[in-house]
Amino acid sequence: MAKLNASERLVTHHSLTIDTKFRTKATQEVKAQCICPVPEMYMLAPLIVKQKGLVHSYDSGNIVVTLQDVQLYPLLPDNSPTHIVLLINSVDKNGSTTVVKNINTNERVEIQPKYEQGEGYEVSTYVVISLNGNKRTYDMICTSTPGVSTGRLNSLLDRILSEVEKGNEG
């Protein structure tokens, strides 16, 4: 298990672009003629908030990612929100054994999850997305956390937006 420093976190800056995905085998000519409306992030934000609790698994269920919490920021009633903040928890059921050592006595204690009971090591990632963008592209920052790669984060964001779309068809 990778060590997380309790007093510091690495934060990376990204650009998030919202676009459409074709889920059919349309020709490039047909795809080029599509003018599907793409909602702005400020319109999607309240719908993303409703996805709180969404769970998705990776690596044959060994990694389980949960959208643990979602908040619009700032929280002040007289201000319009400018950002959406996501708390994403990832549980790795294949994490290695953690060893805690007392440097005074040299006593070592091994701590290992009960994998057969669904336990694993949990880490959290924070994602902050601006609600104001340019050409469907929004500033985003996220904490760098072991087990939550940029690819996995993109996959989860796609999943969240897919669930938003499913819940608002029609």
Question: What name fits each language-model region?
Answer:
Residues V109-E169:
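Intrinsically disordered, low-complexity linker/loop segments enriched in Gly/Pro
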Residues M1-N104, P146-G170:
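Terminal interaction module
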